[in-house]
Amino acid sequence: MDLDGDYLLPGLVELHTDNFERHLMPRPKVHWAEMPALLGHDAEIAAAGITTVFDALGVGEADTDSLRGAPWDRVLEAMDTAGARDLLRAEHHLHVRCELPAPNTIDLFTPFHGHPRLSLISLMDHTPGQRQWENLAQARIYYTGKKGWSHEKFERQVAHSATLQAQYAQPHRAYFVDYCRTHGIALASHDDTTAAHVAQAHAEGAALSEFPTTLAAARAAHERGLLTVMGGPNVVRGGSHSGNVAAAELARAGLLDILSSDYVPGSLLSAVMQLVQDQVLALHQAVATVTCNPARAAGMPDRGELAPGLRADLVQVHMAELPDGNRQAVVRGVWREGRRVL
């Protein structure tokens, strides 16, 4: 295979992307049909060089008009149909994100019970004043800006969220930890802020610390053997949108294991090349964060590397020279299990 000077990389492995949810609800309160949403998401994933994707679907939300407050049955049916009819370019798995303080989290998880694509569960708590939103000032900016809340509504929601957390978070946490243990599902903690958060996750059997918000939490995760996951957009933008620790800072400290595209599929390759361009990581180290490291974390030793006997999941990447002197990674070809899908 002559790639005319382009890079040949292993197919990217994505453990956490919210992109499917964006296709299912492209605007607030606008619900898109499940099959075209799935196929549009799948095409975008493949175009980003991702050959194995864990679609992150959230369960638990007071607002029943939101995706995370509504049943997922029809979405799972679409995934089953598309898989059975060979309509998908990438290999899709399920990553269920469980909002622990929400009253309906366990009920909304029911359709996922025993689903063959279920491979990862993460435990979330987005209560203002906790974890990602430990800084209430940052939380206020986010909710009044993106959500359009008034300051009065924000104050009411903070109080209401604290009440729900006190009632539901711990019993829901115990339920999902037990589910993962008894069903052999990988467990991830989310937005760890302190060493105590990491210690709890480790005791519960978590393998991943998703988006640790502080250097101390990331260091504690490594000390206890948890792999850290940070967002590609964090690298590309030069920092966290919610004011937390920068992914590049963790990489410099040797504390970055895995990159996730989070909410922008194309950010995986862009982040890899950004880390290399900024001399934060060598090329092979940066590529490992989106290939062999997530593959091993997911228990998939058959992919993530270019080696005899492994799956022929491949990505051809061209580095285009731009007028401003920068270089842009461009996906020119994608193969999954030896078959060209893009």
PLM features: what roles do these ranges have?
Residues 167-169, 189-191, 209-218, 237-244:
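A general structural motif
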Residues 182, 224-234, 238-317:
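His/Asp/Glu-enriched, well-ordered alpha-helical/loop segment
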Residues 11-15, 53-55, 90-96, 119-125, ...:
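Hydrophobic faces of well-ordered beta-strands that scaffold small-molecule active sites
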Residues 3-75:
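Metal-associated gating/positioning segment near the N- to mid-region
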Residues 292, 308-342:
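C-terminal cap of metal-dependent C-N hydrolases
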Residues 96-107, 192-196, 200, 208-210, ...:
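Active-site glycine- and acidic-residue-rich loops that bind
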Residues 60-192, 262:
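Metal-coordinating catalytic core of metallo-dependent amide/deamination hydrolases
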Residues 115-119, 201-208, 223-229, 253-257:
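Glycine-enriched alpha-helix->loop->beta-strand junction motifs that scaffold or abut catalytic
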